Amino acid sequence: MSYKLKVKGQYIKDLSFENQNSPQIFVMISKTPPEINISVNVSSVSLPVKAQDQENGQSLDNKVEPLYEVTLQVNAEARVGTTVAFICEVKYCGVFSVENSDASNGEELSQQDMRDMLLISAPSILFPFVRELISRITATGGFPPLMLDVVDFKAMYESQIKQNAAEQNDNGQHTEK
């Protein structure tokens, strides 16, 4: 495959950190380590943008450069018993293009390869930035830095496909009595 995923930009789209039970929670976590629950989600949307003429900067109405926004959402919640220690929610996005590095071969990118690039490769590029961001936010919030484990986005994607197929089978096999 001669296609490359190119990062056009990346940014924080949404960020929230809640530490509503301070300062009492700091006494609680000094005695009992918090239980931390983490969820990770990935989504992508197409962002059609008109291509620009390189020489004069004018819009080329007949060409569209396909761009994609990939969102990596990570939610982390720490609890001591039933008391919330903190909630950290991050939506971190990247704008990507998929470019043919060998335009002479005329090879089309399959939908499956495109999904792999956008839902496996792109979040793998974004993840280190999200991991660092969450580590700094939790430390700034007065907690030990939360270091996220590496995420296997391929396994996550395959699991989601299996779950969707199972849900479709359940919906398709429903019979009325």
From Swiss-Prot:
GO CC field: cytoplasm
Keywords: Chaperone, Cytoplasm, Protein transport, Translocation, Transport
Main location, first listed in the record: cytoplasm
An MF annotation (GO) of this entry: unfolded protein binding
Subunit architecture: Homotetramer, a dimer of dimers. One homotetramer interacts with 1 SecA dimer.
Family: Belongs to the SecB family.
Entry protein name: Protein-export protein SecB
Taxonomic lineage: Bacteria, Pseudomonadati, Pseudomonadota, Alphaproteobacteria, Rickettsiales
